[in-house]
Amino acid sequence: MSTNYLIENIDWEKYEELAKNIIFQVQKLEIDYLVPILRGGAILGLTLASNLNLPTKYIRIKRSITNEINSDFGEAQMINSFDISEIKGKNILICEDTIDTEETIKLAKKYLSEYKPNKIYIATLYNFSKNYDYISGKKMDEHKWVVFPWERKLVQNEN
């Protein structure tokens, strides 16, 4: 699926605003483990772990063909995960940067459900999906390609 979305550049101040929105929502829940999806959910996962003092278990799913703006998407694939057997019977929070088609989230939920957690919550900085059950920094109706501060190219490759 090739995309041609409008581009929205996010600075660190905007990121912090979105993360605070999520923290305020998550504080009301009983979460035992954070499960960020690498790479996109890594920074949000670290932020939540620091602010909420929660243990973290990472999983890695690959979906975009490249990390370039308006990249093509492939089928979501589970690449690997860290040992997540400890989530059995626990309330977990999956962390992702953006959710649009929900393909990555569906794969993550299916994979994690095999370990029999008690409850699975989802947190995302930007929710472009029709699902309003997700904990969102911001719910958006119009799809955009979001460029987070940690994704900006600091040095251009000459290759």
Regions found by a protein language model. Name each.
Residues 1-159:
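PRPP-associated nucleotide enzymes
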